[in-house]
């Protein structure tokens, strides 16, 4: 089962007061030591008065607005430790430590691939995770649902969104699946100076721990809970069998 849960993207966001997105250019990032000088853009930068987006050929994207800067990276290798997003976010923090940082978000995105079983995707959310009720059969078409969960952890808050999705992999036909988007939100508004910078670095460096927890929470709790609920409803047993056989 767990092999069907695939990490698709990782983003790290630094939230601060009064960012100036106009300063985020390839030349600035390279001159500040935030990215290597030999990194090449994959497309022309998108820049407006209030936002900027840079996409590099190695798969890393940098987007900034007046409140945050985000480093995003699609998963292109099985060696997760080779990812650049956290390294670049740390170097950015070291280059600009005086910004009034308020929060850090570590945001993994996962897809639970279910082949071509579109109906099973819907059932896992509507019948598996939600208590059966008359509203399930309301309307002319099978209803859909998006679930938003908030977890208060010891070190941060985890926001988790569960939704239906269609996943395109290369030139293959798009397949249905469950989409899981998470935000591990670390707050540092009460800290200052070197203490704040140290805490932010620690939060960034623990991103692999967050991703592992995220995947475990999905596999062990959410998906298995949905399967168990489907098993308890006779009309859904065949759908559960489909899920387990994929």
Tell where the protein language model's regions lie, with residue ranges:
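N-terminal low-complexity, intrinsically disordered segments
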Residues: 1-75
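Beta-strand elements of well-folded, non-transmembrane domains
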Residues: 16-18, 110-112, 184-188
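Short, conserved charged micro-motifs
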Residues: 20-26, 80-82, 119, 192-201
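Aromatic/basic-lined ligand-recognition segments
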Residues: 113-183
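Aromatic- and glycine-enriched beta-alpha-beta binding-site module
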Residues: 76-115
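Intrinsically disordered, low-complexity regulatory segments enriched in Ser/Thr/Pro
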Residues: 60-79, 165-205, 209
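Conserved short hydrophobic interaction patches
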Residues: 31-35, 88-99, 207-210, 214-217, ...
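Long, compositionally biased interface segments
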Residues: 180-246
């Amino acid at each position: 089962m767990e092999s069907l849960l695939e990490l698709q993207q990782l983003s790290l966001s630094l939230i601060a007061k009064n960012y100036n997105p106009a300063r985020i250019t390839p030349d600035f990032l390279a001159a500040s030591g935030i990215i290597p000088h030999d990194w090449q853009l994959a497309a022309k930068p998108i820049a407006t008065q209030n936002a900027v987006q840079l996409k590099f050929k190695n798969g890393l994207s940098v987007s900034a607005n007046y409140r945050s800067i985000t480093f995003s990276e699609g998963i292109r290798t099985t060696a997760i430790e080779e990812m650049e997003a956290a390294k670049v976010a740390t170097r950015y923090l070291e280059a600009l430590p005086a910004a009034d940082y308020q929060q850090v978000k570590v945001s993994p995105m996962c897809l639970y691939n279910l082949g071509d079983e579109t109906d099973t995707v819907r059932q896992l959310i509507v019948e598996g995770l939600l208590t059966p009720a008359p509203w399930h059969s309301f309307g002319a078409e099978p209803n859909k649902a998006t679930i938003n969960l908030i977890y208060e952890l010891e070190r941060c808050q985890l926001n988790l969104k569960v939704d239906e999705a269609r996943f395109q992999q290369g030139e293959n036909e798009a397949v249905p699946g469950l989409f899981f988007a998470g935000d591990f939100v670390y707050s540092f508004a009460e800290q200052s100076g070197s203490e704040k910078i140290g805490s932010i670095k620690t939060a960034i460096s623990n991103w692999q721990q967050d991703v592992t927890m995220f995947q475990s929470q999905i596999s062990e709790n959410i998906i298995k809970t949905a399967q168990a609920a489907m098993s308890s409803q006779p009309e859904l047993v065949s759908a559960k069998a489909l899920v387990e056989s994929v």
